[in-house]
Design a protein with these regions (language model features):
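A generic structural signal for alpha->beta connector loops
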Residues: 42, 68, 113, 150-152, ...
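Active-site phosphate-binding/coordination module
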Residues: 30-119, 214
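Asp-based phosphoryl-transfer active-site loop
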Residues: 7-27, 203
Length: 269
């Protein structure tokens, strides 16, 4: 099916990060896969990951994760649809506006504390570096450097040791909004799952969100008082299923503000 003509009976969706949200508890993956199978007529399944397209497919095969209906890869720089995973070229045309990867790479070539990651972690719209905060400029300093050279981009710091530079129009959250519009699914009927700081923009907005319990969950602690963000007690895939119950996601009330305020006193674990 063309991406803009999703079946009308699929009126809600679940989008999850891979590494910090689904992977980490292999025993929970069959239960999550069975949940998707039981609800495939009503729930669109999506992945939103920082991994490249090829790397994401490889790790999903390795861990037996069902092939998603939508795959957002490269931190929101590429979108593929359906089981054949055809690419959304309109999205790549959209994010290409004012993007100049060669100029950014030349500008940062001699910057201390930055080292290009291997080619397999790069794509046309994602420039990825290893980051040494002891030697490199802070993230705000890198953004200022780009602006002084009339370059616009999103600069994302993950785990304090990686820097990704992507187009100003690209991010996981912006890609999710684009997909929601294409599929005709209200953001209030979308559950997004994340587990690290790289997922923060994905979790802000009108979608329902869950921070699964893992060792990087504290990076999202600023969201603890944000409505529609639930901090699960269970880790990884079980945390996503916990959020499905918390939000009554499959019931008629999914997305009802009265039902989606996080529990009082809930905090990251």
């Amino acid at each position: 099916l063309p991406p803009e003509k999703a079946p009308t009976y699929r009126d809600r969706a679940i989008f999850s990060d891979l590494d910090q949200s689904l992977l980490g508890d292999r025993e929970a993956l069959p239960e999550f896969a069975e949940f998707l199978r039981r609800n495939e007529r009503t729930v669109t399944f999506g992945i939103a990951t920082g991994r490249t397209f090829g790397s994401a497919l490889a790790v999903m095969r390795k861990y037996g994760i069902p092939r998603p209906d939508v795959l957002i890869s490269g931190l929101g720089t590429r979108i593929h649809y359906r089981t054949v995973l055809s690419e959304d070229r309109a999205w790549t045309d959209h994010i290409d506006h004012d993007w100049s990867r060669p100029r950014i790479e030349r500008l940062l070539r001699d910057e201390p504390g930055l080292k290009l990651q291997p080619q397999g972690r790069q794509n046309e719209f994602k420039l990825s570096y290893f980051y040494d905060p002891e030697l490199a400029k802070p993230v705000d300093g890198l953004v200022d450097l780009l602006h002084r050279n009339e370059l616009t981009a999103n600069v994302i710091n993950s785990f304090g040791q990686f820097i990704d530079i992507i187009p100003a129009r690209a991010s996981k959250g912006l890609a999710l909004r684009w997909v929601a519009l294409r599929l005709g699914i209200p953001l209030e009927h979308i559950l997004v799952a994340g587990g690290s700081g790289a997922d923060e923009d994905l979790m802000r907005g009108n979608a329902l969100a869950v921070v699964v319990a893992n060792r990087h969950g504290e990076e999202l602690s600023d969201l603890v008082d944000v409505e529609r963000v639930y901090f699960a007690r269970a880790p990884y895939a079980r945390g996503i299923l916990e959020a499905v119950d918390h939000y009554d996601f499959l019931g008629k009330g999914a997305g009802d503000p009265a039902d989606t305020v996080p529990e009082s006193g809930t905090s990251p674990s």
